[in-house]
């Protein structure tokens, strides 16, 4: 008889597992390919780009070398194009749960959705850790999640001809409210105050849409959800005048993301203030073979800059090479003279 364990697919074998698909993780995938390392990327979010895409996709970034200005979204698109010659597999909505070092020095890495990796080194490029949505503090919201209560908008079409309430005051809340007004029967934006933490252009667009009667805006806090059967019917709003009921079929709560190291905190790494201590000569953690780069790395005078993360990833991967190929000497070649790299770039350009 074949057991369930026998039916499991074999572990995915690669040189380096990159944890985090933000800008630093994407550049690390490119750099890994340049020096001859295979890699795969995992990220707990449902899209590539990490904190940049989740928190400020359309805000300008001015401190990337040779790029005078670009949005976070544009930067991520350029980084994806840059690593395209090596086509690194990216596994989204996969949170790394456990790591175990094997007798041969390699690592077995498992995710919360059942993926298993066999890798020579692990590169943590997880920013401030896994980002999870800040959820409503209402017990009645839990059974409605994914059906009537949402913390993201995977597909606009799901809200076609629906009565939708969007809660929040940041870029995500305003941007999604504006997008949803084009497909929903009615959209109401709810925020606890009249001021916003969103881009001025988004606030202006929202106010124009309200004035044009394309959507509504109400100042108030969500105090309760009213359900009939298993469906959301209305929302209780608390404001200065008291409480009122607002009809709703769907609630999209966009209160931002909460950073959480999650299982990484249990990996036996030296950690201070939620960040992983590293050796700045190679950005290796207290456990040989596990590296930390970008915002998750901790060392004296650390600067939380994207360009710093690029540098850290470059050095970390050169050390990781020695774990993947301990008997092979890596020969440094400037990219200008790297014929194989030029061929790959040409083939995908």
Curated annotation (Swiss-Prot):
Gene3D superfamilies found in the cross-reference section: FAD/NAD(P)-binding domain
Cofactor(s) the protein needs: FAD
UniProt entry tagged with the keyword Ribonucleoprotein: no
Entry binding sites for FAD: 43, 51, 56, 96, 131, 295, 336
E.C. number: 1.18.1.2
Domain of life: Bacteria
Catalytic reactions on record: 2 reduced [2Fe-2S]-[ferredoxin] + NADP(+) + H(+) = 2 oxidized [2Fe-2S]-[ferredoxin] + NADPH
Keyword presence, NADP: yes
GO molecular function, one term: NADP binding
Keywords of the record: FAD, Flavoprotein, NADP, Oxidoreductase
Any one Pfam family match given in the protein's UniProt record, by short name: Pyr_redox_2
The record's free-text note on cofactor binding: Binds 1 FAD per subunit.
Subunit structure: Homodimer.
HAMAP family xrefs: FENR2 (MF_01685)
Sequence similarity: Belongs to the ferredoxin--NADP reductase type 2 family.
Protein name: Ferredoxin--NADP reductase
